[in-house]
């Protein structure tokens, strides 16, 4: 996934802690075992520091996964790593909720907290 797509902008309130939640209910990728499409909802919750994630670039970043054969756990951790690198938040959580396939659903949650 091309993490260089992710753009940020200056946080105009860096001295105030506030939470931003971004939800993408139409995330798609491909199962690396079966080649079948996977559909899920990605929820990103973060407390920005000096910069915030620009949403249009995030949309294009998510599209990078559309044809990628990648496991749920790898997707979730990769998104967290790339977004933390891009915006260096005070804290961030990425949660992926995957639609049922074969009667089984999965949710993966990963978190980051900056060292003080």
UniProtKB/Swiss-Prot annotation:
The active site is at residues 31, 38. It catalyses: 7-aminomethyl-7-carbaguanine + 2 NADP(+) = 7-cyano-7-deazaguanine + 2 NADPH + 3 H(+). It is found in: Cytoplasm. Its EC number is 1.7.1.13. This is NADPH-dependent 7-cyano-7-deazaguanine reductase. Pathway: tRNA modification; tRNA-queuosine biosynthesis. Belongs to the GTP cyclohydrolase I family. QueF type 1 subfamily. Gene3D superfamilies: 3.30.1130.10. GO terms for molecular function: preQ1 synthase activity. One of its GO terms (cellular component) is cytoplasm. Its main location: cytoplasm. Keywords: Cytoplasm, NADP, Oxidoreductase, Queuosine biosynthesis. Pfam families: QueF. Catalyzes the NADPH-dependent reduction of 7-cyano-7-deazaguanine (preQ0) to 7-aminomethyl-7-deazaguanine (preQ1). Substrate binds at residues 53-55, 72-73. GO terms for biological process: queuosine biosynthetic process; tRNA modification.
């Amino acid at each position: 996934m091309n993490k260089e797509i992710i753009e940020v902008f200056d946080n105009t309130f860096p001295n105030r802690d506030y939470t931003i939640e971004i939800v993408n209910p139409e995330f798609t990728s491909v199962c690396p075992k079966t080649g079948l499409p996977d559909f899920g909802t990605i929820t990103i919750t973060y407390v920005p520091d000096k910069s915030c994630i620009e949403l249009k670039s995030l949309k294009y970043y998510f599209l990078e996964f559309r044809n990628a054969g990648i496991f749920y756990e790898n997707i979730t951790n990769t998104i967290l790593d790339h977004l933390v690198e891009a915006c260096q938040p005070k804290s961030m959580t990425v949660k992926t909720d995957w639609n049922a396939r074969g009667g089984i659903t999965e949710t993966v949650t990963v978190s980051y907290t900056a060292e003080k």
